[in-house]
């Protein structure tokens, strides 16, 4: 992808940036469970002074049941359709920060819509980091307690090639969330400069 931005492409040491720009499109966070989409998304929205939405929460409210129940009762196709409807609606509401479900970006239609209408940021965690955050948690419908490593290993193998299609990749580490947010802001700023050269940004990074 010509305009793909990976934070590793810059050698500058992350420092706490003063946000003096607005993204030209909604910012959509993608990644597997445990990557920090919700926690980072909320902090990122505060730094940008933008609304924050969790698409999983919106899907559950629209359906009147949990993501796990939608999948088990109505099937994966119904879940994909519901996620596409909700995510497209959120994107069309205007510029905001959106945290998506762990597999949302792996669905072709949803991925295509996000890529056309938003800035996608992949919070990429390695297996060790993801396991540290999700092992033993009961609120992860796609994970079976005791088999987290096996399931996550397979998901990384299957889904990371699709997540690579995101506009921006930021590696999530075992570090304070505020530092990760700083790195996301810097990555978004650099991506905008590269991809939207006519878009005016007051640089304070």
Task: Mark where each language-model region is.
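Post-Walker A helix-loop "phosphate-sensing" segment adjacent to the P-loop in P-loop NTPases
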Residues: 46-55
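ATP-dependent small-molecule kinase phosphotransfer cores
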Residues: 54-115, 140
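Hydrophobic anchor at the beta1->P-loop junction of P-loop NTPases
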Residues: 29
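A glycine- and Lys/Arg-enriched "phosphate-lid" helix/loop adjacent to the NTP-binding pocket
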Residues: 116-161
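NTP-dependent small-molecule kinase module
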Residues: 2-22, 43, 47, 93, ...
């Amino acid at each position: 992808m010509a305009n793909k931005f990976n934070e590793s492409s810059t050698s500058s040491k992350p420092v706490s940036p003063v946000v003096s720009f607005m993204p030209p499109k909604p910012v959509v966070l993608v990644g597997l469970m445990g990557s920090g989409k919700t926690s980072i998304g909320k902090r990122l929205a505060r730094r940008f002074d933008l609304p924050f939405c969790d698409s999983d929460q919106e899907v559950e409210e629209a359906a009147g049941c949990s993501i796990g129940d939608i999948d088990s009762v109505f099937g994966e196709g119904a879940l994909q359709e519901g996620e596409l409807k909700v995510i497209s609606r959120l994107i069309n509401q205007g510029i905001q920060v959106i945290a998506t479900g762990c597999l949302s970006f792996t669905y072709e239609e949803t991925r295509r819509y996000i890529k056309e209408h938003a800035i996608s940021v992949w919070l990429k965690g390695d297996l060790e980091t993801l396991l540290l955050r999700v092992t033993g948690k009961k609120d992860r419908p796609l994970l079976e307690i005791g088999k987290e490593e096996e399931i996550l290993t397979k998901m990384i193998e299957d889904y990371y090639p699709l997540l690579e299609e995101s506009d921006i990749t930021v590696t999530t580490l075992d570090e304070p969330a505020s530092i990760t947010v700083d790195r996301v802001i810097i990555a978004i700023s650099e991506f905008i400069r590269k991809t939207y050269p006519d878009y005016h940004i007051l640089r304070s990074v």
